[in-house]
Every structure is written in C-alpha cells, then in structure tokens.
Amino acid sequence: LEWLEALESGAYEQGKDCLNKDNKFCCLGVACDILSKKGTVLKTVKENGIVDYDNLSTILSEEVIDLLKLNGSTGGFWNIRDEFPHLSLASANDGGKTFLEIAAFIRKNPDVVFSDAREVQ
C-alpha cells in the first residue's frame, strides 16, 4: 500500500492530535495527504497551521474511511492484540508508536485494521 510505504519512508514528520499541523502528521494524516495530492480529498490549510481534509482536522471523513477500508474515523480495531495495546491507529500514533511500528502492525494484522482485508492489497 502506498500509505504504508509513505509511513515507512521517513518522508513525513510525525505529530500528534491532528491529522496534519505545521506539516507534522498523524499516521492517518499521511493517508489523507496522499489522497489530497491525487485530488480525492479536499485539503484546506487554516491560519493556525492545522490542515483540514474534507473539512475535518482530527478524524477521517466517511469518504476516506471507505477508500482506505478502515474501521471508523480513527482507524479503530475490532480486535485488540496484546503486543499493540491501542484501540485505534490514532491512539497508537498519539500514544507514542512510531510510523514504522504502526506500519509494521498494519502489515502483520490487516484483518484487525481493515474492514475487509481481502480488498486491501
């Protein structure tokens, strides 16, 4: 997935609490940035440095959820794995997991992260 490759690339600086603030990204904000560059998602930069994607700055829009095949606006998990004690991708990001750790978890557990892992390749 292009999104996971971007998380692993080191091209994005990691941030917390917003999808993108001052060019520091949540793991979900990286996906939004990729989609905005493709013209799929509307990107709006506000004066305070916070970036909205489809008019949202802290959670994913329904369109992005559907495009990424995620379980909800924060990338929630339906099942929790002991080695990754978070309830969502957003909480993992804000709780200190690195982009590399998040990408590795997604690759190892697509059935937990995606609503239909068979459709995500």
Where are each of the predicted segments found?
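Domain-length accessory/inserted modules outside core catalytic folds
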Residues: 1-25, 32-121
